[in-house]
Amino acid sequence: MIAIIVVAILATAGRSDKICIGYHANNSTTQIDTILEKNVTVTHSVELLENQKEERFCKILKKAPLDLKGCTIEGWILGNPQCDLLLGDQSWSYIVERPTAQNGICYPGVLNEVEELKALIGSGERVERFEMFPKSTWTGVDTSSGVTRACPYNSGSSFYRNLLWIIKTKSAAYSVIKGAYNNTGNQPILYFWGVHHPPDTNEQNTLYGSGDRYVRMGTESMNFAKSPEIAARPAVNGQRGRIDYYWSILKPGETLNVESNGNLIAPWYAFRFVSTSNKGAVFKSNLPIENCDATCQTVAGVLRTNKTFQNVSPLWIGECPKYVKSESLRLATGLRNVPQIETRGLFGAIAGFIEGGWTGMIDGWYGYHHENSQGSGYAADRESTQKAVDGITNKVNSIIDKMNTQFEAVDHEFSNLERRIDNLNKRMEDGFLDVWTYNAELLVLLENERTLDLHDANVKNLYERVKSQLRDNAMILGNGCFEFWHKCDDECMESVKNGTYDYPKYQDESKLNRQEIESVKLESLGVYQILAIYSTVSSSLVLVGLIIAVGLWMCSNGSMQCRICI
């Protein structure tokens, strides 16, 4: 009878009201790395790195790029005859140079500081081409016969459209020629000149005459003087001679003076920079140019994103994310995603004391599950969830600001220095990128660890808040759950959730129920002890009886001799 009562009471206790603290889980398979772990599955995360692109060139701020087509930068800017379609004023958002372009420097030679020139041209947005030194500037010399088969046009010999190859006339010696140009405008002027180096003395004498020859150029900020270097060289493009090509900038208010008595490749047409930008670019690519608009253009294509970083290309123009070498910069915003195991039931942790998250709780990160006579259900704790959301949002913005500060520091450092030093900065940029990439990855790993720890702490805090309210009015089940010693209807459950639980109100009922359960447990323990003693004694008597019976049987059939001595 006592055992039946115990079973009945325990069964009733199994249907007691309960409340559990838990956290959100979902079907996400997204994984992040932390400073201590790799491939941690989380409920929510944000990828800071863009890696998708549209493989085409578009307009930037409604301004089209300049397609050099079959010409190189050198061929266009010097005026290769095959690049006549590019003559005239030009404007662009950026310049596209094709890797297969063949029309560059036609008469063999080297353009001095070409990379710096490309950086300068890339920073321009609009240029006006004008005649700087008309042919009439140079008297007593031939300004029309300086052509070469190396620079053909319409099957005949020609020369660069922006340079003038000056040679002596057949009837007179090459006299000293002089020219001057004063930049009275407000824009800087890009101009070119060259020095011809014949392969032998015969060609030198034929073109310029015998004797020492020189080319001199000078402004308020530049001085140049060079004499021809006559030497035998291998043929390139059918020519054994060479031309050294030079360029410079004539600043507003400066005057360019030219003087030569031979071997001068004189400036003819020049470019006036009407509009410049510090964010220009020259892209070398075969991507098509299409009638489209973009805010971010890279050499690899268009980016359309609101992400902070990209790993598509370090060469870009427009409003683009910063480039890093990382494959991913995924920042955790949610919790570890550990959905509960069905066989373990509902009650069960993050933080070491709840075994799994709740996929049924969808309106918050942390919350409750209750069970009473009126039913059961989930409810999110909106206050702790909102605080966590705000904190993580601020964290994401803070990380972005920290990374942007790293990137912008060096740019500001070089912004007011000469272009040559700025170019050196670009060459060093790859090394800076390694450091920035490492810093970005390390920062994300550290913040991911902190985010998961934050969620852990928030669940624990919620658990401790409930525990401090219930005290001994509920039994701790040890898995994030509490079993009430009293009846707790929906109103009671709500008071626990919102922190207004009235402990004294339920104290007496809880105490009484707790004592009854403990009493039944003690009585049931006594019954079990009596049954255990009875069972032990009974088993011993049966065993002794069996031994005696076997002994008598063996004595009766002679298998064992029995002697009784008195």
Swiss-Prot record:
Domain of life here?
Viruses
> Where is this protein chiefly located?
virion
S-palmitoyl cysteine-type lipidated residues? C555, C562, C565
PTMs per UniProt: Palmitoylated.
Ranges of the Cytoplasmic topological domain: 551-566
Q: Which UniProt keywords apply?
A: Clathrin- and caveolin-independent endocytosis of virus by host, Clathrin-mediated endocytosis of virus by host, Disulfide bond, Fusion of virus membrane with host endosomal membrane, Fusion of virus membrane with host membrane, Glycoprotein, Hemagglutinin, Host cell membrane, Host membrane, Host-virus interaction, Lipoprotein, Membrane, Palmitate, Signal, Transmembrane, Transmembrane helix, Viral attachment to host cell, Viral envelope protein, Viral penetration into host cytoplasm, Virion, Virus endocytosis by host, Virus entry into host cell
Cystine links in this protein are C20-C481, C58-C292, C71-C83, C106-C151, C296-C320, C488-C492
What InterPro entries does the record point to? Capsid_hemagglutn, Hemagglutn_HA1_a/b_dom_sf, Hemagglutn_influenz_A, Hemagglutn_influenz_A/B
Site Cleavage: list residues.
R344, G345
Record's keyword annotation contains Signal = yes
Give me the Extracellular side stretches, as residue ranges.
17-529
- GO BP annotation list: clathrin-dependent endocytosis of virus by host cell; fusion of virus membrane with host endosome membrane; fusion of virus membrane with host plasma membrane; viral budding from plasma membrane; virion attachment to host cell
Has UniProt tagged this entry with the keyword Iron-sulfur?
A: no
Q: Where in the cell is it found?
A: Virion membrane; Host apical cell membrane
- Single GO cellular component annotation? membrane
Q: Which GO terms describe its molecular function?
A: host cell surface receptor binding
Role this protein plays: Binds to sialic acid-containing receptors on the cell surface, bringing about the attachment of the virus particle to the cell. This attachment induces virion internalization of about two third of the virus particles through clathrin-dependent endocytosis and about one third through a clathrin- and caveolin-independent pathway. Plays a major role in the determination of host range restriction and virulence. Class I viral fusion protein.
Against HAMAP family, the record matches this protein to: INFV_HEMA
The miscellaneous comment for this protein is: Major glycoprotein, comprises over 80% of the envelope proteins present in virus particle.
Name listed for the protein in its UniProt record: Hemagglutinin
Give the organism the record lists.
Answer: Influenza A virus (strain A/Shearwater/Australia/1972 H6N5)
| Taxonomic path | Viruses, Riboviria, Orthornavirae, Negarnaviricota, Polyploviricotina
